[in-house]
A protein has these predicted regions:
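Short metal-coordination and nucleic-acid-contact micro-motifs, chiefly zinc-binding Cys/His arrays
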Residues: 4-12, 62, 89, 131
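Short cysteine-rich clusters marking metal-coordination/redox-active sites
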Residues: 11-13, 66, 93, 135
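Cys/His-coordinated zinc-binding microdomains
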Residues: 12-20, 70, 97, 139
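Hydrophobic alpha-helical transmembrane segments
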Residues: 57-70
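A cross-kingdom signal targeting lumenal/periplasmic-facing segments of multi-pass membrane
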Residues: 73-75
Length: 355
């Protein structure tokens, strides 16, 4: 008989994850501070009602198109739900850590290692490739018709920054954050948008610039990735299939083997891409999309530096780059290139001294 699917309340006893202190307060952190605990509530707002009307959805709170991400327990066979478990709890424990199995009874035991938990069936979220695959499904992959209503934003998956913003219910404050998490996330994001285009699951006008900007970003960062052309000649099935494969392999490799010296190297290389933003070097929309991804990358790579090593003036210049990148559709590539040069100059020897 299949194990019952547990709700968050089943994990909230004081002897498990509902106690006090850093080691057992995970339920309190999730329920009081984490937006995932309120994901179902988003389906009951007036904004959701307008979106539902545009999509001819009678009730977003039970529509498979909505609950798959906002209330994953609604997708579980009701016969398998434990007593009192309701989809309204949103994105809860089992949504990320895996459905109940052999790992449930022993995962809080002090004599169990992380490897023991994983071998028993708990999802290995310490592995950045596994984590990226878990998160990207709802933090990037979204029905283009939903975005087309004008009431739901197009999502940008950036694993490092989004993990940093997450209220921490894990013990190691530095686990799974930094340049490695950023890079793995971007490679997975490229794989997913390319797969969606290949399989007709994305709206090309929105998604081709995203795929191009991610491919460009990974290529310019310098970690052994050959830029895959996206455009009239390179956006066909063969090119997309190749990108899906390459990006997936790149994400796996970066998750399993990482040289810390890559972060300053990538920061230096990406800050030196001003020539790509000379007016006319690429179509205007392409440059705007690349700028949007670039400033996010510079932010994460700069944040990965020890605070005392961050050059004075770099943060202020980065703020100006964010402002310029967010000026679509009035993006000014010349102004962006000029400010990018200032940012590169502010980095100076602190970064150029890297390998």
């Amino acid at each position: 008989m299949a194990a019952e699917t547990l709700g968050a309340a089943d994990c909230s006893t004081s002897g498990c994850h509902g106690g006090a202190g850093d080691k057992s307060s995970q339920f309190v952190t999730w329920s009081q501070h984490d937006v995932h605990a309120r994901s179902f509530a988003a389906l009951t707002t007036s904004r959701s009602a307008r979106m539902s009307e545009a999509l001819s959805i009678t009730d977003a709170s039970v529509s498979p198109r909505c609950v798959v991400c906002h209330a994953p327990l609604a997708t579980v066979d009701p016969a398998l739900l434990g007593a009192g478990v309701e989809p309204s709890e949103g994105v809860s424990c089992v949504s990320c850590h895996n459905l109940p199995g052999g790992w449930i009874r022993g995962h809080t035991r002090s004599d169990w290692t992380h490897a023991d938990r994983v071998s028993a069936g708990m999802r290995d979220l310490n592995d950045l490739y596994t984590r990226a695959n878990t998160c990207v499904a709802c933090h990037q992959n979204i029905d283009p018709e939903i975005v087309g209503t004008g009431h739901h934003p197009a999502l940008v998956f950036e694993m490092d920054g989004q993990t940093q913003d997450e209220p921490r219910h894990w013990r190691d404050p530095a686990a799974g954050i930094g340049a490695q998490a950023w890079f793995v996330g971007q490679a997975v994001a490229l794989r997913e948008v390319s797969w969606a285009l290949l399989n007709g699951r994305a709206e090309p006008a929105r998604s081709v610039p995203v795929a191009d900007s991610l491919s460009w970003l990974l290529d310019r960062s310098g970690l052994d990735f050959k830029e895959q052309p996206f455009g009239e000649a390179g956006n066909g099935p063969d090119a997309l299939a190749s990108t899906v494969e390459k990006a997936d392999l790149l994400a796996k490799r970066a998750a399993r083997s990482w040289d810390p010296s890559f972060a300053p190297t990538a920061l230096r290389r990406l800050s030196s891409t001003g020539a790509d933003f000379i007016p006319g070097a690429s179509p205007h929309l392409v440059q705007a999309s690349r700028a949007d991804r670039l400033v996010l990358a510079l932010d994460r790579l700069l944040s990965a530096m020890p605070a005392p090593s961050r050059p004075a003036g770099a943060s202020q210049s980065l703020d100006r780059l964010f402002h310029l990148a967010q000026s679509q559709p009035d993006f000014d590539p010349a102004a962006f290139a000029k400010e990018l040069s200032r940012f590169s100059g502010a980095l100076g020897v602190s970064v150029s001294a890297g390998p």
